[in-house]
Amino acid sequence: MTAANIEGALERNRTFAAGGGHEGAVVFPNLRLFVITCLDPRVDPAHVLGLGLGDAIVVRNVGGRVTQEVTNDVAFIGQMAEIMVPDGPLFEVAVIHHTQCGAGALADDAFRRRYAERIGAEESSLREHAVLDPTATVTHDVERLRSAGAISSRVTVSGHVYDVVDGLVQTVVAVDRVLAG
């Protein structure tokens, strides 16, 4: 029997805990930043953006897409933040898509059909989650968040594309306020 893949990470956790790395961590992010990005390990925002513990809230999913669940998460954090920050801006949501995204496979009919069967989803609903042109998809997702009625107008949203080849994140949709709320 081989050791579990998590064993090395658990050992590093013990070192982290013994060193007190968790002490003083805050619930509300230090940078007032909420990052939505892909679950691809090449796009780890702690490394790509140089984030430390407590700097940002990070939500990761296939393609870094703004789904209803992600919108609900932003709305929840916004409502919590309104309690802690009675006036002024609450936080910025940075939507980050990336080049060479595996979510592009959702554009392939055969792949999408098999995946839909596997997860029990409507195949037609999955096509819109494909990331073939990250500039276009991040722009779409930023607009989706900005027009979501459940999100506070004190939240700002921006859109970015991370190039996995050169390692740079480029802003493609400048920061602006949520329209609704």
Protein language model regions, located:
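Gly/Ser/Thr-rich loops at beta-strand to alpha-helix junctions
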Residues: 39-42, 99-103
